Amino acid sequence: MFGFGQLIEILKKDPKKIVFTEGEDPRILEAASRLLASNFLHPILVGDPEKISASAEKSGFNIRGAEIIDPMNFDRMDEMVELFCELRKSKGVTPEQAKGILSSANYFGTMLVKMGIADSLLGGATYSTADTVRPALQLIKTKPGNTIVSSCFILVRPSATGENEVLAMSDCAINIHPTEDELVEIAGESAECAKIFGIDPKVAFLSYSTLGSGKGEDVDKMRNAAHKAREKYPNLPIEGEIQFDAAVAPRVARTKCPQSEVAGHANTFIFPDINAGNIGYKIAQRLGNFEAYGPILLGLNAPNNDLSRGCNAGEVYSMAIITAALA
């Protein structure tokens, strides 16, 4: 089952470069110093080199070896501006406008990924989710065949057997009212994400109804989405619509859906909307004593993840490992 040691071993074999858009933030600097000491990731800090160095020195963090790139003094800015204008030509962006936009650390950092200078990006310690995600949607864009970006939380809790209990929950942060087809896409992306963390995905499309016990448009949406997902991913164990207790409790599953291979053993949960998803993962985190990692953005051409503005340095460090491992 999942442990960060597994991801670190993968990264040691193929170290990645990760952009931190808030290079002066002490939490970012502490995480970067830990990553540099471990030597399995190469941090790129965006910002004024003098301010970053002063902040690191004041906080007592050794960031020697980190690459610092200043948007105001970038030797490939003309190339970046030209590419940005090409990517945004449908909006009629001029070079002067591009230079102004690229003074934003979020847009600048995202373009570093787009240009191949970095493999992934982590931001949001001081910016809103919208400010962090918008450049990725405009510049990195979705993978071929994908129509949306979604999100997944990985929840980890030590079990009595000594192995970690690991679950995946989606979409808890991005899509407010996903359609049936969007739920299908979310399920497929979440299952692939789950595999990276050692989960053999068993997918449950959650509802207040189990296999027809309730009725209504919301029930129909989850039932139809589960049916479409089974058709699209024939090798992926999927159940739905299903209530949470039937999805996770074998005793309840034997009563409500005894023929299901997923019921009672689900580990990848697809919520009907963002309300249910956000509430659900936070209940698991606060009352179930799970560590929650995310939101992990799914469906992009390159990893771009969003931190909570209330994050600490340990959470930055963990999300950096996760983000790099997805590259």
Where do the language-model regions lie?
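Anion-binding alpha/beta catalytic cores of soluble intermediary-metabolism enzymes, centered on
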Residues: 1-263, 268-327
